Amino acid sequence: MSSAAMVKAEDSLEPTLQNLLDQKTLRWVFVGGKGGVGKTTTSCSLAIQLAKVRKSVLLISTDPAHNLSDAFGQKFGKEARLIDGFTNLSAMEIDPNGSIQDLLAAGGGQGDDSMGGLGIGGMMQDLAFSIPGVDEAMSFAEVLKQVKSLSYEVIIFDTAPTGHTLRFLQFPTVLEKALAKLAQLSTQFGPMLNSILGGRGGLPGGQNLDEILSKMESLRETIAEVNAQFKDADLTTFVCVCIAEFLSLYETERMIQELTSYHIDTHCIVVNQLLFPGKDSSCEQCKARRKMQKKYLNEIEELYEDFNVVRMPMLVEEVRGKEKLEKFSDMLIHPYVPPQE
């Protein structure tokens, strides 16, 4: 008997992600979990399903590993690009390490060169990177800034592993601290630096430090606006991806607790890589692993009885390319029926 049968049908929620397709107000979907559990495959597959019911869908990778290009067999960059074979599904990969440099360059060039050769660019960059989590915060802010200028009906984030994702979601607080520190430095040294820069011809594009700080304040306002949307369950949800093992389950529980503390909705869990050996299977390892997985599946059912829990099988081939992703995505909507155990 499968673990699904251990929960009464009338008490259990639909074991699919169909509810996300039916929620027409949904604008932001985050897909996250521990490394190596199938986040990218799940986010790509969900994007494919959403593209069937929405006018325009954007899939964004904020994971430094960037697996979207590998999943679809197509190169993506920091500009949104239509995915081959689709008319309304685009993808982009943001480099989390590039956004602060881009912002602080503020007029062209890199590092010291962009600050008139005075080393101020390096100083500002070091200051920014010295604040814990600011890299995640700023890269996320840059993503939002780009997304805000585009017109997509729903946006899916293929996020970095759990720790990075949770820091991403704390970015408003982190950015406030960064801005406060920069404002303090500007008050203390701004007139002197502007005077020195004036003698050296100023910053590229005729900007000054006040203009840079003004840009950062504008960025903060964008973040505040989108952050309000993130806390609206009608607009935003987080899909947790895990496997039926202790560490993954532990990470998922920690993530759900943190998401709840941030007031971000989460009600869907995708459990990947499940083994379903047939009744006559002679694979002892498969049976032993299935026994372990059933134990953790039971725990998931007990812990998250008010969640949509989707069970996905371990496949014999890698899920890469449009065809295989489409096949995998169907199982997110139409539950996989395992062989009789």
Swiss-Prot record:
- What subcellular locations does the record give? Cytoplasm; Endoplasmic reticulum
Q: Where does ATP bind?
A: K34, G35, G36, V37, G38, K39, T40, T41, E245, N272
Q: Please provide one cellular component term from the Gene Ontology annotations of this protein.
A: GET complex
Give the EC number.
3.6.-.-
Superkingdom classification of source: Eukaryota
Chief place of localization:
cytoplasm
Which family does the entry's similarity section mention? Belongs to the arsA ATPase family.
What this protein is reported to do is described as: ATPase required for the post-translational delivery of tail-anchored (TA) proteins to the endoplasmic reticulum. Recognizes and selectively binds the transmembrane domain of TA proteins in the cytosol. This complex then targets to the endoplasmic reticulum by membrane-bound receptors, where the tail-anchored protein is released for insertion. This process is regulated by ATP binding and hydrolysis. ATP binding drives the homodimer towards the closed dimer state, facilitating recognition of newly synthesized TA membrane proteins. ATP hydrolysis is required for insertion.
Instruction: Please give the name of this protein.
Output: ATPase GET3
Give the source lineage, highest ranks first: Eukaryota, Fungi, Dikarya, Ascomycota, Pezizomycotina
